[in-house]
């Protein structure tokens, strides 16, 4: 997702240093406390190094087209996750949407279970994402729009987006959604982690996203699933949001689309928390965030490496954020993604590197 990471991480260091309990520290309202360093590292110590992608099927323009009953496509999911398995990937980050659940809660969970069964057959664990502040702020159920030619993520939708500001009473419905899904899958070993909120504060929301961010962590603690809860930091100008995210995440997740030097600075800053790190978004070729530059560094530090995009398709994420190509021709340098829809690859050199790092045959 589009965002800005400053070169200097002063804001993070100043506002988000590991929390020290003081007499003034208010008691957290959560049903269980955040994992401490020992708990987090105990969870991670026997885990493999994870490498994977943010995954939505190439035939889906957004989360709704992925999960609605009429467009859910297990055949495409199976085929594309087989390609991921073939290059040694073992983790996918997958976005949900409350509107797909709202239409059909039981059917939605059955489709989630079907996806998980397919992923598990390919040796792939899953990280699900609940809320998202990126791209289009309104949406509707039913048939989704066609992609805009040559335009990055033209149909991706926020969740809940503008709805929560127009109808604050929807907070209760969002609580029901989150708790229903978490309770149903609370002990599902196919799920590695719950990513509660993607890039809170994006799209100009800033601190307006704080109430939902606080609520979704509270709802998660009240359900108390066996999997860790997290929300990734992505823009260190959002100091209040960052502070809350880092203090309330069981393990630390983050996004970085910058070059290796800037990414290394971010790693150094986040390692002070002493918890496992998972990079849940990276790899934007034209911004020097490439597999060659970043993936070996992540493996060396046992940081999960989850790039944006597996198969080029309706999301149009081969095109850069702010550089549409009106003709729709394929850019010389893809921004995101690895495979074409026929299974051919953008770069065999990248595939060779990924397979070397993941020890895939």
Where do the language-model regions lie?
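Sec-dependent signal peptide recognition
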Residues: 1-9
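C-terminal motif of bacterial Sec signal peptides marking the signal peptidase cleavage site
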Residues: 12-15
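Bacterial signal peptide processing site
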Residues: 17-19
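Active-site mouth of glycoside hydrolases
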Residues: 28-249, 255, 260-262, 273, ...
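Structured C-terminal subdomain patch of bacterial secreted/periplasmic proteins
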Residues: 323-324
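Catalytic domains of carbohydrate-active enzymes that cleave complex glycans
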Residues: 356-361
